[in-house]
Amino acid sequence: FGSPENEENMGEFVECVQGIGEAAEYLKFPVVSGNVSFYNQTKDEGIKPTPSIGGVGLIKDYKKMITMDFKEVDNIVLVIGKTEGHIDQSLFARNILDEKNGPPPEINLFNEKNNGETLLKLIDAGYIKSAHDVSIGGIITAVSKMCIKGNKGINLKKPKYLINEIEYFFAEDQGRYVIEVNKDSLKKVTDILNKNAVHYDELGIINKDQMFINEKTKVTIDELRTSNTSWLTNYMSK
């Protein structure tokens, strides 16, 4: 944060801490430590608020732990949680559109908790083969990481309720997860999602080695991996 002697900066600090506290209490998330620092500014302009917190989670049975790498060709990939297409404050908006204004994604603590707890039920039942959260970079980034890690591709599709492909694949709406299930488990998985009032989209089908984004756009897993491992070198050489 900037200087706490500035009323606006102090207000940001108070609201951030209160917001984190409200969310942690609702989600029953155990925060064990945290840190902020003040007077981070150039002249009279403070940096963006960046509080840090540390939490603890418990895996009851490590044998049921799920990794993010895609496992098997022809398995089905779903997105848990609804994509509204929120682009403001996203990585895409900042880096591609060069837009830094606009509100962040809406926070819905009920959906956040419900979606997460339902995913845990699916994992505990043994239906999930791989899973990854959707955060910075949106669905396309989460799926790319799963492809690279599992050395598998995917035939992507977007739902009919969102016309804009950019918004669907790059939006950073909260409370979403990408999951992999096999065809035999699909009906059981969707029944549990429906029973718990969790929105989901069928995102695609896993293939051997390419990400098909649409009829005109595809990328190989080797190309994805090269982009992922060489970005820092390319950035530093500019």
Description of each model-found segment:
Residues F1-P4, N9, G21, E25-L27, ...:
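Mobile "lid/hinge" segments at catalytic clefts and subdomain interfaces of large enzymes
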Residues N9-A23, L27, V32, V36-S52, ...:
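Glycine-/charge-enriched secondary-structure boundary and capping motifs
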